[in-house]
């Protein structure tokens, strides 16, 4: 997932932060004390600091706001007749870089710092800066000067990306209501500030949640010894199980005690229930009201205008059509799961209730995989120690994209477990950027998997290039005594996916910060990373990614073939669940009066055929609703149509490690960043219109 925390200017995502579609239009260079930082920025290096104290975060936030406001005031007072590209648009673009880099150091620590006070200060900084972003994005005086520039300058004399920057600035100004009356603008501004705070609080609540449950060893039946040994023990000789992914999913997939799974699923989907339900009850109507004031029927209509799908009707047709096509497959998978459950209940003496409960789904889908394909993920993970996976992943990406990675010794990082790498073009030696790897869970850390864009790759005022910097933030299991962190295959896939976002951040080479990295349409942003997931289903790639953690012996060819064949297991139910989440998201953003828990329960029954557990409220734990995917969660499935088309028509056809195809992908899909429309990039790569054939086949359906 891509996490966006500031506007269209930066990629921070998810799998967190509020993704505010605001256009920062800043003016001349900031004055001291930020000048020192600006001079480092001009050198194009990684200038990010992670040692700011809570007081420093507060002080620098106030300084950034005060000095940036002076810049806006200056731009807003330029006489209209004196407005030129150089003194308006170019100046605004130049200062964006300084603002983004400084803001990163202030608001990113909320997601990764080990210090609760630093996280709190960073969260407050994010709230203040988000309010400021809204205030400045609605400066009518600055907007008037940009409009005047478009009306008077010779657009043919400026580069295409600069024209796009100008057009997008005006488009975003109108989407912020700057063409409306002052009274309506003030209403919109006030509501946007409140929405921003609600989004930040929603995800902060999830990040800070530390709920845990206590079970006896018997209640954790069938879980492997290495998992149980990794758990914290209580004074009563029981085991503390958290709701973090490295604990939750192993229990849901392997624990043979239904009551334990029921308690875990209930707790997982009631996280932050009270506070986040209240937030959604405020946030959804606010979004609807803003959309109405701006002339849109619904919030979904508002956000989709900028996406490749364009309309709610196209999204609904896509989801409904896919749901119908998958219905027979889903029914067959449910019937098989029920047969497994009935058999196990008879063997273990459990009462058989004749239905699939929410806490049964992961457990019996895991059994399905083991029975149909003889793939035991618990045994398989012994071949995926994190050091081997990381080495193999980096090797594959380097070879495929013509890059070289070098770990930075004694790097300045926010936690001692974090590592930093420099990325260079293999042919020229040019430094393209850097990325951090933050792989393990800790208290207060962002609890999903995401790529955060920290420093934009773009041109600086002196014509040199600012290197792009990104962070891959995930939560794999911690190493324990005598055993490294071992990844399940689905975690290897997640690693590849998020690193695909990192490569998008690093390889994009744009002129403007606003178009750097993953700043593309939301329903296109997952395309590059999804496409790269295909490598973890390739036998040769899997050999590079695996080695038994004890003696280094490889996975057998037979097991590799079974693993690859298992790709289609449960694909009906897994895709139907994605459709459920997409439909819930669309519903809540087309009718803000709906009850989120009821809407989720309705679609679970109608589409998935597995009822939501009474008393839970999954949408209150659904970070995407407040993390930049509002009205746009469908984008995960929508973009997979494009990613599968690219993979099968080019990489599968020419060889998945073919360096020529890899460079074509790097140059035509990654390098443009957001400087081109997603559909234009796709057609440049495919040399035709995209189609659904490969996507449908990947779901076990007839491609025609």
UniProtKB/Swiss-Prot annotation:
Binds 1 zinc ion per subunit. It holds the Pfam family Peptidase_M3. It is found in: Mitochondrion intermembrane space; Cytoplasm, Cytosol. GO terms for molecular function: metal ion binding; metalloendopeptidase activity; oligopeptidase activity; peptidase activity; peptide binding. It is an enzyme of class 3 (hydrolase). InterPro entries: MetalloPept_cat_dom_sf, Neurolysin/TOP_dom2, Neurolysin/TOP_N, Pept_M3A_M3B, Pept_M3A_M3B_dom. Disulfide bonds: none annotated. Its EC number is 3.4.24.16. One of its GO terms (biological process) is regulation of skeletal muscle fiber differentiation. GO terms for cellular component: cytosol; mitochondrial intermembrane space; mitochondrion; plasma membrane. It comes from the Eukaryota. The modification N6-acetyllysine is found at residue 664. Keywords: Acetylation, Cytoplasm, Hydrolase, Metal-binding, Metalloprotease, Mitochondrion, Protease, Transit peptide, Zinc. Residues 1-37 form a transit peptide. Zn(2+) binds at residues 497, 501, 504. It catalyses: Preferential cleavage in neurotensin: 10-Pro-|-Tyr-11. Its cofactor is Zn(2+). The active site is at residue 498. Belongs to the peptidase M3 family. Hydrolyzes oligopeptides such as neurotensin, bradykinin and dynorphin A. Acts as a regulator of cannabinoid signaling pathway by mediating degradation of hemopressin, an antagonist peptide of the cannabinoid receptor CNR1. This is Neurolysin, mitochondrial. It comes from Rattus norvegicus (Rat).
């Amino acid at each position: 997932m891509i996490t966006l925390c500031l506007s269209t200017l930066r990629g921070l995502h998810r799998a967190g932060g509020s993704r505010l579609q605001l256009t920062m239009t800043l003016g001349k260079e900031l004055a001291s004390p930020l000048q020192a930082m600006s001079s480092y920025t001009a050198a194009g290096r990684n200038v990010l600091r992670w040692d700011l104290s809570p007081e420093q975060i507060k002080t620098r936030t106030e300084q950034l706001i005060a000095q940036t406001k002076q810049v806006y005031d200056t731009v807003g007072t330029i006489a209209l007749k004196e407005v030129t590209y150089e003194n308006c648009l170019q100046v605004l673009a130049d200062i964006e870089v300084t603002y983004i880099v400084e803001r990163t150091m202030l608001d990113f620590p909320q997601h990764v710092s080990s210090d609760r006070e630093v996280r709190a200060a960073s969260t407050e900084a994010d709230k203040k800066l988000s309010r400021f972003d809204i205030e400045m994005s609605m400066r009518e005086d600055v907007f008037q000067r940009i409009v005047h520039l478009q009306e008077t300058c010779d657009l043919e004399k400026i580069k295409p990306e600069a024209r796009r920057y100008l057009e997008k600035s005006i488009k975003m100004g109108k989407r912020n209501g700057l063409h409306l009356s002052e009274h309506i603008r003030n209403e919109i501004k006030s509501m946007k500030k409140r929405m921003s705070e609600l989004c930040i609080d929603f995800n902060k609540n999830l990040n800070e949640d530390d709920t845990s449950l206590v079970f006896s060893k018997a209640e954790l039946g069938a879980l492997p010894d290495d998992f149980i040994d990794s758990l914290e023990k209580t004074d009563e000789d029981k085991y503390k199980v958290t709701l973090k992914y490295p604990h939750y999913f192993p229990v849901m997939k392997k624990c043979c005690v239904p009551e334990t799974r029921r308690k875990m699923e209930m707790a997982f989907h009631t996280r932050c229930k009270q506070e986040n339900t209240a937030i959604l009850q405020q946030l959804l109507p606010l979004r609807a009201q803003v959309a109405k004031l701006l002339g849109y029927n619904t919030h979904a209509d508002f956000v989709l205008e900028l996406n490749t799908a364009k309309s709610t009707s196209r999204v609904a047709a896509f989801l409904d059509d896919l749901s119908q096509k998958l219905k027979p497959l889903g029914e067959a998978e449910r019937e098989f799961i029920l047969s497994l459950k009935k058999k196990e209940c008879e063997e273990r003496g459990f009462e058989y209730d004749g239905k699939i409960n929410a806490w049964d789904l992961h457990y019996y889908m895991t059994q399905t995989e083991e029975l149909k394909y003889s793939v035991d993920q618990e045994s398989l993970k012994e071949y995926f120690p994190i050091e081997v996976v990381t080495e193999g992943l980096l090797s594959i990406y380097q070879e495929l994209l013509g890059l070289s990675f070098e770990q930075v010794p004694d790097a300045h990082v926010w936690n001692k477990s974090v590592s930093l790498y420099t990325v260079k073009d293999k042919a020229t030696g040019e430094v393209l950027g850097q990325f951090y790897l933050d792989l393990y869970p800790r208290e207060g850390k962002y609890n999903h998997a995401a790529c955060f864009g920290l420093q934009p790759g773009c041109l600086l005022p002196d014509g040199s290039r600012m290197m792009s910097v990104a962070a891959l933030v995930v939560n794999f299991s911690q190493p324990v005594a005598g055993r490294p962190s071992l990844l399940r295959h689905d975690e290897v896939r997640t690693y590849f996916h998020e690193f695909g976002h990192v490569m998008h951040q690093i390889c994009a080479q744009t002129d403007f910060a606003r178009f750097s990295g993953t700043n593309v349409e939301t329903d296109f942003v997952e395309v590059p990373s999804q496409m790269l997931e295909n490598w973890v289903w390739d036998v040769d790639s899997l050999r590079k990614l695996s080695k038994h953690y004890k003696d280094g012996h490889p996975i057998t060819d037979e097991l590799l073939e079974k693993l690859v064949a298992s790709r289609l297991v449960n694909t009906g139910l897994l895709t139907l669940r994605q459709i459920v989440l997409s439909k819930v998201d669309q519903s809540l953003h087309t009718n803000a009066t709906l009850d989120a828990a009821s809407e989720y329960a309705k679609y679970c029954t109608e589409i998935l055929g597995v009822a939501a557990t009474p008393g839970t409220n999954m949408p209150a734990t659904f970070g995407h609703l407040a993390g930049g995917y509002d009205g746009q969660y469908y984008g995960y499935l929508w973009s997979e149509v494009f990613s599968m088309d690219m993979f099968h028509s080019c990489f599968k056809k020419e060889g998945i490690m073919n360096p020529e195809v890899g460079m074509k992908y790097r140059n035509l899909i990654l390098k443009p960043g957001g400087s081109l429309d997603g559909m234009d990039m796709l057609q440049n790569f495919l040399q035709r219109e995209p189609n659904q054939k490969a996507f449908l086949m990947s779901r076990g359906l007839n491609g025609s």
